[in-house]
């Protein structure tokens, strides 16, 4: 069995519990909340790797004692689990809710989905995504979460095509192709010229929703 970062077999199951609601941004004179620790740990994950996420390093970074950390997490492992739960919620479940509300038709939702990676905050999210997946290549626990996230996303994309009138098997193939385009565009659009964004969106959407003659 592959090595786990948490060292607990039950950690993958704890990820299925509902995540706490994200706290609002704290004032400078207010105590740290759980989200502050998660954000700091994510910053280290992107800048270094998961091995760089150490309690003493986090405390130094945030200017607090270890007691503040242990107020929110029993162990470093609990923080790692919380990071993955937070990533799944913010970058998958919340995105699905946002896309669902963003358009009245499945085609409009697909277009908004394709446009996600060009939004201002997308580069930062792409860095987190890449770092999580790099971690998952070597460790079992995050790999299970990444696999679950991929299935959730693919299932949602597939349902968009089913709602647009495509058969289930065809919808699954189009969903996979859509996922490949979104993931690839999130990496490549900053270094390669794919043409005007609006033109790219319309041509890609037309290709993905085109029916055989």
Spell out what each predicted region is.
Residues 3, 143-147, 162-213:
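Hydrophobic/aromatic-rich alpha-helical bundle segments in the mid-to-C-terminal region
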Residues 82, 96-127, 175-178:
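Hydrophobic alpha-helical connector segments
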Residues 92, 122-130, 138-165, 173-176:
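Amphipathic alpha-helical packing segments from all-alpha helical-bundle domains
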Residues 33-36, 40-82:
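Helix-turn-helix
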């Amino acid at each position: 069995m592959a090595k786990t970062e948490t060292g607990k077999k039950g950690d993958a199951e704890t990820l299925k519990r509902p995540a706490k609601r994200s706290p609002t941004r704290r004032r400078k004179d207010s105590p740290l909340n759980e989200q502050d620790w998660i954000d700091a740990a994510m910053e280290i994950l992107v800048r270094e790797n998961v091995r760089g996420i150490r309690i003493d390093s986090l405390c130094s970074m945030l200017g607090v004692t270890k007691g503040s950390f242990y107020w929110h997490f029993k162990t470093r492992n609990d923080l790692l689990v919380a990071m993955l739960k937070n990533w799944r919620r913010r970058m998958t479940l919340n995105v699905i809710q946002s896309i669902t509300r963003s358009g009245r038709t499945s085609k409009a939702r697909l277009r908004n989905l394709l446009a996600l990676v060009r939004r201002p905050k997308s580069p930062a999210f792409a860095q987190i995504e890449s770092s999580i997946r790099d971690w998952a290549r070597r460790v079992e626990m995050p790999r299970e979460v990444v696999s679950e996230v991929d299935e959730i996303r693919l299932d949602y994309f597939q349902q968009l095509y089913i709602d647009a009138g495509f058969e289930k098997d065809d919808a699954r193939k189009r969903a996979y192709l859509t996922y490949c385009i979104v993931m690839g565009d999130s990496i490549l659009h900053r270094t390669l010229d794919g043409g005007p964004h609006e033109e790219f969106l319309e041509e890609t959407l037309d290709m993905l929703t085109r029916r055989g003659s």
